[in-house]
Amino acid sequence: MNKIIKGDRVVVIAGKDKGKQGQVVRVLGDKVVVEGVNVVKRHQKPNPMRGIEGGIITKEMPLDISNIAILNPETNKADRVGIKLIENEGKVKRVRFFKSNGSIIGA
């Protein structure tokens, strides 16, 4: 189980976009794409066969997962994530929790 998944609110803790907040759009192994963060301009070549217009486009590039931290909604601060096992009706389930206060993420 990954500590950061799609849909999490995160804050950038290192790099040129330090302090910016956003939502995780995609997780790519040890990198994540965050909405509105690490935006770059790229030149797009037109391709009429695929219906792609040419020009300069802006897109979000992946950030290393070590440069972001999940945002705790209770404290509105960056927090660390832990994983613990919870037994429910004989089944063991892995859940993520905030290390600062122990509250379960997404519950």
Swiss-Prot record:
May I have one GO cellular component term?
Answer: ribonucleoprotein complex
Q: Which CDD domains match?
A: KOW_RPL26 (cd06089)
The lineage's top-level taxon is: Bacteria
* SUPFAM superfamilies reported for this sequence: Translation proteins SH3-like domain
Q: Does the keyword Flavoprotein apply?
A: no
The record's annotation in Pfam families points to: KOW, ribosomal_L24
Q: Which PROSITE patterns match?
A: RIBOSOMAL_L24
**MF annotations from Gene Ontology:** rRNA binding; structural constituent of ribosome
Keyword list (alphabetical) reads: Ribonucleoprotein, Ribosomal protein, RNA-binding, rRNA-binding
Q: Which InterPro entries match?
A: KOW, Rib_uL2_dom2, Ribosomal_uL24, Ribosomal_uL24_CS, Ribosomal_uL24_KOW, Translation_prot_SH3-like_sf
By its UniProt entry, which SMART domains does this protein fall under?
KOW (SM00739)
Q: Which GO terms of type biological process are on file? A: translation
> What this chain does, per the record?
One of two assembly initiator proteins, it binds directly to the 5'-end of the 23S rRNA, where it nucleates assembly of the 50S subunit. One of the proteins that surrounds the polypeptide exit tunnel on the outside of the subunit.
Q: Which PANTHER family match?
A: MITOCHONDRIAL RIBOSOMAL PROTEIN L24 (PTHR12903)
Its assembly, as annotated, is:
Part of the 50S ribosomal subunit.
Q: Which family does it belong to?
A: Belongs to the universal ribosomal protein uL24 family.
Q: Any idea what this protein is called?
A: Large ribosomal subunit protein uL24
Q: Which organism is it from?
A: Neisseria meningitidis serogroup C / serotype 2a (strain ATCC 700532 / DSM 15464 / FAM18)
Q: Which gene encodes it?
A: rplX
